[in-house]
Amino acid sequence: MDRAQKEQVVEELGQIFDASGVVVVARYEGMTVAEMQDLRAQMRDAGGSVRVAKNRLAKIALDGKPCASIADYLTGMTVLAFSDDPVAAAKVADKYAKGNDKFVILGGAMGDTALDPAGVKAVAQMPSREELIASIVACIGAPASNIAGAIGAPASNIAGILATLEEREAA
């Protein structure tokens, strides 16, 4: 890899570190190509990406970035998992690590907050942005549906009583 290619890699990684909501660093030593492709596919489905880069170039790209705290984890065979959604990459990495002993989470960063492996696991257990929005909408909509039910209930009760009275008169 010549100098121009290295500069391009550093630039790309810098853009990734700036744009990502979360970055997870993991060791992938011993993983097969098929396993790595499976990880990439799962991450892509969740809206994230996986990138293998030279640690030295990644450390240069981290200089001055909010997630610079992950530089300490960049030793050995490491892979970077990242996503715009603050929890997507952590969720996929945590799930994949549970099913594959060769994939070991070393740590990560969420913005300027450093995460150890337990921190990445905690982020992975958080609900996603879509799940949070759905629960907020449900909370907002619940009072309205309760009011509609309360308003409609007396009318249905009266209709039931009238139907019962009609049946008694007919009998």
From Swiss-Prot:
<comment type="function">
    <text>Forms part of the ribosomal stalk, playing a central role in the interaction of the ribosome with GTP-bound translation factors.</text>
</comment>
<dbReference type="InterPro" id="IPR002363">
    <property type="entry name" value="Ribosomal_uL10_CS_bac"/>
</dbReference>
<dbReference type="GO" id="GO:0015934">
    <property type="term" value="C:large ribosomal subunit"/>
</dbReference>
<keyword id="KW-0699">rRNA-binding</keyword>
<dbReference type="InterPro" id="IPR043141">
    <property type="entry name" value="Ribosomal_uL10-like_sf"/>
</dbReference>
<dbReference type="InterPro" id="IPR022973">
    <property type="entry name" value="Ribosomal_uL10_bac"/>
</dbReference>
<comment type="subunit">
    <text>Part of the ribosomal stalk of the 50S ribosomal subunit. The N-terminus interacts with L11 and the large rRNA to form the base of the stalk. The C-terminus forms an elongated spine to which L12 dimers bind in a sequential fashion forming a multimeric L10(L12)X complex.</text>
</comment>
<protein>
    <recommendedName>
        <fullName>Large ribosomal subunit protein uL10</fullName>
    </recommendedName>
</protein>
<keyword id="KW-0694">RNA-binding</keyword>
<dbReference type="GO" id="GO:0070180">
    <property type="term" value="F:large ribosomal subunit rRNA binding"/>
</dbReference>
<keyword id="KW-0687">Ribonucleoprotein</keyword>
<dbReference type="GO" id="GO:0003735">
    <property type="term" value="F:structural constituent of ribosome"/>
</dbReference>
<keyword id="KW-0689">Ribosomal protein</keyword>
<dbReference type="InterPro" id="IPR047865">
    <property type="entry name" value="Ribosomal_uL10_bac_type"/>
</dbReference>
<dbReference type="Pfam" id="PF00466">
    <property type="entry name" value="Ribosomal_L10"/>
</dbReference>
<dbReference type="GO" id="GO:0006412">
    <property type="term" value="P:translation"/>
</dbReference>
<dbReference type="InterPro" id="IPR001790">
    <property type="entry name" value="Ribosomal_uL10"/>
</dbReference>
<comment type="similarity">
    <text>Belongs to the universal ribosomal protein uL10 family.</text>
</comment>
